Regions:
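Non-ligating segments of multi-cofactor redox enzymes
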Residues: 1-189
Length: 189
């Protein structure tokens, strides 16, 4: 894959504390011509004792993608920029191994096409030097595509974390979650 304009210093950041649940990201993602009018990002509402927390579910683009590792058809690939691409339509057999294996619960099987679909970080845009659609429309900047230095200046009390612990499994990702200063890892029980 050639991406003459892909900017390697750019990273994707998710700040759950800033998400207002407006779903502008979902609408923008669904409008992308590569998604078949499906959103590859999802806003979830988690009921708390007296409030509702919104969470954003997006592909984390793992350094060692479990979805690709369990694919018997070798349909899922990771490129030299760390982007884990959605299943190759000519190879995907629709087995759903990737759907069941992803620790973040991101890939889904599109029954209409009998294949796996997921976010590819708007590769058609990012490889041309543009931002992913979801990050361009987020009014609260809960989704941000930029440099670590920009993020440091914008959020001095937070740090980007891209290491997650699921039991004994440690997963490193291309996408960062903003956490309180001093955090180095997010443990998911």
């Amino acid at each position: 894959m050639t991406a003459a304009y892909y900017k390697t210093e750019m990273e994707f950041f998710v700040d759950m504390q800033r998400c207002i649940g407006c779903k502008a990201c979902e609408a923008a993602c669904a409008e992308c011509e590569t998604n078949g009018q499906q959103s590859m990002i999802h806003v979830n509402y988690v009921e708390r004792a007296v409030t509702i927390q919104t969470t954003v579910q997006v592909c984390m683009h793992c350094d060692d993608p479990v979805c690709a590792n369990v694919c018997p058809a070798d349909a899922i690939s990771k490129d030299e920029f760390g982007v884990v691409h959605t299943a190759n339509t000519a190879r995907c057999i629709g087995c759903s191994n990737c759907v069941m294996a992803c620790p973040f619960g991101v890939p889904f099987k599109e029954e209409k096409y009998d294949m796996m679909m997921k976010c590819n970080m708007c590769y058609d845009r990012t490889s041309a030097g543009k931002k992913p659609m979801c990050a361009t429309v987020c009014p609260s900047q809960a989704l941000y595509y930029g440099t670590r230095e920009e993020m440091r200046q914008m959020r001095p009390n937070s740090v980007p974390v891209n290491t997650f612990q699921f039991g004994k499994l440690e997963v490193k990702t291309k996408v960062n979650i903003m956490m309180p200063a001093g955090s180095t890892m997010l443990k998911v029980d």
